[in-house]
Amino acid sequence: MADAPVGPAFAERGLDLSLRHYLAEVAAPTPTATGGAVCAITTASAAGLVAMTARLSTFDGADRLAADAELLRSRAQALATEDGAAYAAVLAARREGAAALRAAYARAAEPPLAIASTAAETAGLAELLARCGKRAVRGDA
């Protein structure tokens, strides 16, 4: 089955895109919100692996670590959508003048900063699991 044509769909449909269509969106030569969304989705995927690794581990605190990873996964998913919306606002502000565009750019910088923070927290949990997690799945963390 063919996917829908490629275009600025991520800002509109975000995480509801098929993986195939999402990857086409990333590669498309269109002005879409992809950089932040890619980082956020990658972070959400990493947090999912951390959660899985923690659930398969038996050390004290593994359950709490899995819950923390789930919160990070949820946050990263939301940030993917927020980043797309912020970029769409920048595109819309281009028609409104310099002041509106500056304000939109300032707001558009917020989701990537939050994505970076979420990724750093996820990496911290992964590092802990790489040391303390179940040996068979440490590499997945």
Located regions from the model:
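Amphipathic alpha-helical interface segments
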Residues: 83-141
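Polytopic transmembrane helical bundles with strong interfacial aromatic enrichment
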Residues: 2-17, 41, 118-122
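Amphipathic alpha-helix face/heptad-repeat signature
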Residues: 38-45, 65, 72-79, 108-122
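Short, hydrophobic/aliphatic alpha-helical segments
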Residues: 14-32
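Amphipathic, well-ordered alpha-helical segments in soluble domains
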Residues: 18, 22, 45-52, 79-82, ...
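Transmembrane signal-anchor/signal-peptide helices with a preference for the extracytoplasmic
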Residues: 52-60
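A structural-propensity feature for long, helix-poor, extended segments
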Residues: 59-96
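Conserved phosphate/anionic-ligand binding catalytic regions in large, soluble enzymes, centered on
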Residues: 28-51, 137-141
